[in-house]
Swiss-Prot record:
Entry protein name: Gamma-D-glutamyl-L-lysine dipeptidyl-peptidase
Catalytic residues (positions): 200, 253, 265
MF terms (GO), sorted A to Z: cysteine-type peptidase activity; endopeptidase activity
Catalytic activities: The enzyme releases L-Ala-gamma-D-Glu dipeptides from cell wall peptides via cleavage of an L-Ala-gamma-D-Glu-|-L-Lys bond
Sequence positions that bind substrate: 90, 199-201, 218-219
Gene3D superfamilies named in the record: endopeptidase domain like (from Nostoc punctiforme) (3.90.1720.10), SH3 Domains (2.30.30.40)
Involved pathway(s): Cell wall degradation; peptidoglycan degradation
Underlying gene: ykfC
Keywords linked to the UniProt accession: Cell wall biogenesis/degradation, Hydrolase, Protease, Thiol protease
InterPro entries named among the record's database cross-references: NLP_P60_dom (IPR000064), Papain-like_cys_pep_sf (IPR038765), Peptidase_C40 (IPR051202)
Record EC number: 3.4.14.13
Keyword Protease: yes
One of the Pfam families matching this protein, by short name: SH3_YKFC_2nd
Length: 296
C-alpha cells in the first residue's frame, strides 16, 4: 500500500537495528535534521557508509510503497528512486510514524522548493516544518507573496521566493550546472538526497530531477543511464564516472562535467561540494565512463 512521507526528510535505513544512539534525532515524526548533522562526529558521519547504516532519504510528500511491518518499522520501496536493488524502486526501512496513509492529492500544478531549505507555514504565519530543496507540493493558489499548497496536514503556505512552479519543460545542461552550483560548500552526507546534504550520486540524481530528468539513485546504475559518450568527447552537463584500480574496477564516484576540464561533485565525508580541475588528480586516472542524460 502507498503511503505519504510526513517528515521533512526521512532516512531510509538498511535495517531496523541500523540506527545508532547519535541517530535519535532522525527517528521522530518531526525530524531534527540540523541537530543530527551538527552533532555527528566525523567518525559517525563516516560510519553511515562504512557501517552500512542508511541507504538513501525521502522528502516530505513523497510516496513510498510499504511491503512489510515489524513493530514500529516498515519495509518500504521508493518508486521515485530507480535502483537495480528492486525493479519497483529503492528498498529500505523507515519508522512507521514518519508515514501516513493518504488519498492522492490532485491539483493542476505543483511547486517545488528551490532553496536548500524553506519553511512550510500555517495560515496564521507560524512556521510548521523546514522542508528540503526538491520537495514538491500541489499548488492551490497564489496569495500575497505565498503559494497556498495542499499537504497531508491540510492547506499550508510557502513563500513564493522559496519555490518555483514545476515545469513540464526539461532543463538544459547549463540549467543543471547552475542548479548544482547553488550548493557549493555544502558538506557531503552519505545517503543524502536533500538540501541539507548529498552524497555523490544523490547530488546528481537531485539536480537532474530538479530539471525534469529521472535518473537512477546510485552511481553504478547511473552509469547505464542516458547514452554513452567517448571519454575524449565529453560536454558540459555530462555525468563522469570513476572506478577503483585506475578505472578498471568497480564504480565508486560520479560527478558533473562543467567544461574546461572541471567537475562539480560532492566528494566524500569530511569534504564539501566543489568544482575541481581534473588534471593531475586521482580522478583523472580513475575516469572510466561518460554518460549524457540531458536533452541536447
Amino acid at each position: 500500500m502507498m503511503h505519504t512521507v510526513i517528515s521533512a526528510v526521512a532516512n531510509i535505513w538498511t535495517a531496523p537495528d541500523s540506527p545508532r544512539p547519535s541517530d535519535q534525532f532522525m527517528l521522530q515524526p518531526t525530524v531534527m535534521i540540523r541537530d543530527w548533522l551538527e552533532r555527528m562526529t566525523y567518525d559517525e558521519r563516516l560510519g553511515l557508509c562504512t557501517d552500512n547504516v542508511i541507504q538513501t532519504q525521502v522528502l516530505f510528500g513523497e510516496k513510498v510503497l510499504v511491503t512489510a511491518e515489524q513493530g514500529e518499522w516498515v519495509s518500504v520501496i521508493v518508486p521515485s528512486q530507480p535502483s537495480r536493488k528492486d525493479p519497483r524502486g529503492y528498498p529500505g526501512w523507515m519508522k512507521k510514524y514518519q508515514l501516513e496513509k493518504t488519498k492522492p492529492i490532485h491539483t493542476q500544478h505543483d511547486v517545488m522548493i528551490s532553496k536548500p531549505a524553506a519553511f512550510l507555514y500555517r495560515s496564521n504565519g507560524e512556521k510548521e516544518i523546514e522542508l528540503s530543496f526538491l520537495t514538491v507540493l500541489p499548488l492551490i493558489a497564489k496569495e500575497n507573496g505565498y503559494f497556498k499548497v495542499s499537504t497531508v496536514f491540510g492547506e499550508r503556505f510557502v513563500r513564493q521566493s522559496d519555490a518555483v512552479p514545476v515545469s513540464q519543460q526539461k532543463g538544459t545542461a547549463e540549467d543543471i550546472i547552475q542548479t548544482g552550483a547553488f550548493f557549493l560548500g555544502l558538506p557531503y552526507l552519505w545517503g543524502g538526497i536533500s538540501g541539507f546534504g548529498f552524497d555523490c550520486s544523490g547530488f546528481m540524481y537531485s539536480i537532474f530531477k530538479a530539471n525534469g530528468y529521472s535518473i537512477p539513485r546510485d552511481a553504478g546504475d547511473q552509469a547505464k543511464a542516458g547514452k554513452g559518450v567517448p571519454l575524449d568527447d565529453m560536454k558540459a552537463g555530462d555525468l563522469l564516472f570513476f572506478a577503483y584500480e585506475e578505472g578498471k574496477g568497480a564504480i565508486h564516484h560520479v560527478g558533473l562535467y562543467v567544461g574546461g576540464g572541471k567537475m562539480l561533485h560532492s566528494p566524500k565525508t569530511g569534504k564539501s561540494i566543489e568544482i575541481l580541475t581534473l588534471t593531475e588528480t586521482i580522478y583523472e586516472k580513475e575516469l572510466c565512463a561518460v554518460r549524457r542524460c540531458f536533452s541536447e
